[in-house]
Amino acid sequence: MEVSTSSMSSKPEQMQNPPPMISSPRFQPQIISPHHHDQHQHLSNPYPTTFVQADTSTFKQVVQMLTGSSTDTTTGKHHEAPSPVNNNNKGSSFSIPPIKKTNSFKLYERRQNNNNMFAKNDLMINTLRLQNSQRLMFTGGNSSHHQSPRFSPRNSSSSENILLSPSMLDFPKLGLNSPVTPLRSNDDPFNKSSPLSLGNSSEEDKAIADKGFYLHPSPVSTPRDSQPLLLPLFPVASPARNS
């Protein structure tokens, strides 16, 4: 019983005089180096794994210290990091060449280009043939086969096939007679008026002046009956009655 009373008497004293709290030092992050038996693996791996022990309050500072840019505490200036292009060129012995893009022509553009090339080639061939034919006509050949200085396709020999392009021909100087003769009012066969048509025109003018209209006679000359014949489409009498 005495022991219990003494313990109870000591409790209020402890409550009145609490023990002083011991302040613990602030936790500092520590970097754990790899073990001795993993040193060979650490040397072979260019990116080793780093284990860090940090407090929750200082974790952000530790991450920034390990991953952030290096700063000089004395001068307060940032060190310039080397450009990644130079590092890549130093580390690798070759560089990737740029990809050359070829111009893709569309189908209709290629067709137009081909047509233009064919037209140019034909024009060049025609000009060469025309020059050669002119040399033969003006300078070459016997005296009996001399052509007139006035060039005309009709005077050229039929054995020579000369291809002439419209751009190379000078039409005013060629003196070509047009195969189509101009039609005059007297020579027009459609304007020839017969005496019957003249009489009809006078009657037509009189009828139009009197009645205001004129009926032309029908040009059909086939004989016709006065009344058209009606075909029996339906039987008039029943077949039973006829039998």
Curated annotation (Swiss-Prot):
Post-translational modification: Phosphorylated on serine and threonine residues by MPK6.
Cysteine disulfide links: none
Protein name: VQ motif-containing protein 33
PANTHER family per UniProt: VQ MOTIF-CONTAINING PROTEIN 11-LIKE, VQ MOTIF-CONTAINING PROTEIN 33
Source organism per UniProt: Arabidopsis thaliana
Cellular component annotations (GO), alphabetically ordered: nucleus
Biased composition (Polar residues): 1-16, 84-98, 191-201
Keyword Metal-binding: no
Residue numbers bearing the Phosphoserine modification: 83, 95, 148, 152, 165, 167, 178, 218, 221, 238
Residue numbers covered by motif VQ: 59-68
Keywords: Nucleus, Phosphoprotein
Region (Disordered): 1-49, 69-98, 138-162, 180-243
Compositionally skewed regions (Low complexity) per UniProt: 149-162
InterPro entries in alphabetical order: VQ, VQ_4/11/13/19/31/33
Superkingdom of origin: Eukaryota
Cell location: Nucleus
The keyword Lipid metabolism belongs to this UniProt entry's keyword annotation: no
Pfam family for this entry, one: VQ
Underlying gene: VQ33
Primary localization class, coarse: nucleus
Biological function: May modulate WRKY transcription factor activities.
